[in-house]
A protein has these predicted regions:
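A generic hydrophobic-helix recognition signal that picks specific residues
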Residues: 19, 49, 95-98, 279, ...
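Transmembrane and membrane-interface helices of multi-pass
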Residues: 2-238
Length: 641
């Protein structure tokens, strides 16, 4: 060690410090989100640590590259003060950035259950109100801000000690020294390339490799946010797939369908619903887990007395979301388009593609179409999206035009906005199809002053606002029931995605995506609670079925009343999850498929793919056909009838 030049000792020590800080932020990430992960024993921890190190070295090789290259390259003027200052600036900027994004994800992860990726920049760009929310986030997550201050102080202190210990002028006095240091420079560049690639394997390290070190639920502990950001930056969103011929893929899975209502579905109503006579209202609740309803959580406390009472007169399915963000949930509900790529569809390069929707189909049948959301106009590009898919009218914060009901963060409180919606529906022509996306049950979970203390606070911060939104829905239905259009209106109530949960049943791989799925009509004769799953993408074809719509539709779902194969599909970090026939499979291209019997093994501990080879083969075949249809239709702009 004594023969190693001081300059190299300094570089190695600073590199080790950067690695240490990345490790610490990973530990902080886990400590703040412990309840979201399940770790079994030391062997699991060790395996995850090895994977974590591999991803950490890849991140360091990218973000420290400017500092390392400047420090290692043999130049005669490296002792210049300006040059040294530039080295230090690059070193500090890289480390501060890595700490900041890892700590931001510490708070943000519990809302999306995935590490931040490069699409976050476009997501924030269409948020419309992000700048105004920064002070609120800093207040609510003060503990993360404090953690950053402590870690930054520790980092600065340790770096000063390192520089004091290994400070020395770097001078090259001979051609031999220059040659030696040039070889060291070339060697280090080669090592950086290997580290960035994650090793010498054929393909570079990517997000999917994290599943080699742990269960899918724990991959976020192996990954780090600096890696997921740089690895997804500038990448093509989708690639064409050719697992099967065009004829064969359609025989396995075809997104072009013709609605076919079963006779028994018609018998549930006083008389069959008909297109041209039945109004449709789709209510999408913000951040609403199935756990909040007694209808789904029979052992827990209910925070939704109205929804539970409405469910007693409705058709209830086991709802599952196709994404974890609002920007992904709305297209899944309205256009039957799930999230099957790293970037949100609405902010991707495909965002201008033509999409089908129930609104577009029903507008051809003479329906008026309207979308309601009390948030800022332009939020997540919803106003442009709904117009593109056939909604004629958009009612947002601007149209509401009364800031006395502004919540100070996102938009108009739910109760007054839902009353406003009833008034607007009274005025538009009939029949109509309308969709509502609520707002209040979202961080920072504020409710109007006059309602504080009225709703149970529960065990989680979200519970009080869930009670408020439930109350807003009650007032909406009370007012709407006085209108002529109410008696002939089909209501579908769901959520954009799930949110905070406390019970183990709702923390499993599947439980994290459980949302309400309630179908109500005043003429409904039979209350029904089904064990059948209904994903967000099933809403469009299900309504088309119930209304006896005759035209073909394009969708990545199936009517829950049709005899077609029912399934649930979800994508995260390169892994496709398929629930079909009671089995849950996990598919990653190039890897062996995993298969689990979900009801008996909700924690997905026992891979039965080898035991049930036919079922595993069926799941693989279906998943690959789905991927091919999804990718190729989006790439070719064919996601419409």
């Amino acid at each position: 060690m004594k023969r190693i030049p001081q300059a190299y000792k300094l570089i190695l020590s600073r590199y080790a410090l950067s690695l240490l800080m990345l490790y610490i932020t990973q530990v902080v990430f886990y400590l703040f989100n412990t309840e979201l992960f399940h770790i079994d024993g030391f062997s699991s921890v060790w395996k995850m640590f090895c994977g974590c190190t591999r991803y950490a070295l890849s991140s360091l090789s990218v973000f420290l590259a400017p500092y390392l290259l400047m420090s290692l390259i043999p130049l005669p003027f490296k002792s210049n003060k300006i040059y040294k200052a530039a080295e230090n600036i690059f070193f500090y900027l890289a480390n501060i950035f890595m700490m900041v994004v890892n700590l931001i994800d510490t708070g943000y992860y519990r809302f999306t259950f995935k590490r931040l990726t490069a699409d976050i920049t476009r997501y924030l760009g269409v948020g419309g109100d992000f700048d105004e929310l920064i002070p609120q986030f800093l207040r609510d997550y003060w503990h993360i801000v404090l953690t950053f201050i402590v870690l930054l102080s520790l980092f600065v202190l340790l770096d000063r000690l390192i520089r004091r210990r290994f400070s020395a002028k770097e001078e090259i006095h001979s051609a031999k020294q220059y040659a030696t240091r040039s070889m060291v420079f070339v060697l280090c560049v080669a090592l950086l390339i290997v580290a960035q690639r994650g090793g010498l394997q054929t393909r570079p390290l990517n997000l999917m490799h994290a599943s080699m070190y742990c269960e899918t639920q724990n991959t976020a502990l192996v990954l780090n946010t600096p890696f997921t950001l740089y690895r997804t930056f500038g990448k093509p969103t989708l690639r064409p797939k050719h697992f099967f011929s065009e004829k064969e893929v359609k025989s396995i899975y075809d997104p072009h369908i013709t609605p076919q209502t079963s006779t028994w579905a018609d018998t549930l109503f006083a008389s069959p619903l008909q297109v041209g006579k039945t109004n449709v209202v789709i209510i999408v609740l913000e951040s609403f887990s199935a756990e909040y309803l007694k209808t789904y959580n029979t052992t827990g406390t209910t925070y939704t007395p109205f929804l539970d009472s409405l469910a007693q007169h409705s058709i209830v399915f086991q709802g599952l979301s196709n994404g974890k963000r609002s920007i992904d949930g709305i297209p899944a509900v309205l256009s039957s388009l799930p999230l099957m790529m790293e970037e949100s569809y609405l902010t991707s390069s495909y965002g201008d593609n033509k999409l089908g929707s129930l609104a577009a189909d029903l507008s051809k049948q003479g329906y008026a179409t309207a979308f309601f959301h009390g948030g800022y106009n332009g939020t997540m590009n919803f106003d442009n999206y709904v117009k593109k898919v056939g909604f004629e009218y958009y009612y947002g914060k601007d149209e509401y035009n009364n800031d006395k009901d502004y919540d100070g963060n996102w938009g108009i409180y739910d109760e007054p906005f839902l009353q406003y919606m009833v008034k607007q529906l009274d005025t538009i022509s009939k029949p109509f199809v309308a969709s509502l996306f609520t707002l209040s049950s979202h961080h920072p979970y504020s409710i109007p002053a006059q309602h504080k203390g009225k709703f149970p606070k529960g065990s989680m911060i979200v519970h009080e606002t869930v009670g408020y939104t439930d109350y807003a829905l009650k007032r909406f239905f009370e007012q709407a029931s006085k209108s002529d259009w109410f008696s002939n209106t089909l209501f579908v109530i769901t959520a954009d995605h799930s949110a905070l949960t406390s019970q183990e049943e709702f923390k499993t791989q599947l439980g994290l995506f459980k949302i309400p799925m309630i179908i109500y009509h005043p003429s409904l004769k039979h209350h029904l609670v089904s064990d059948m799953t209904m994903q967000q993408t099933d809403i469009y074809p299900t309504i088309a079925d119930l209304l006896h719509l005759k035209n073909d539709i394009f969708c990545f779902g199936r009517s829950v009343f049709s005899p077609q194969q029912h399934y649930y599909m979800y994508y995260t970090n390169g892994e496709y999850l398929l629930l079909m026939d009671g089995y849950l499979s996990k598919y990653t291209e190039g890897h062996s498929l995993e298969l689990y019997f979900e009801k008996e093994d909700p924690g997905l501990k026992n891979n039965i793919a080898e035991k049930y080879k036919d079922t595993a083969a069926k799941h693989k075949r279906f998943t690959e056909a789905f991927i091919q249809q999804y990718n190729n239709n989006i790439i070719s702009n064919s996601t419409h009838p």
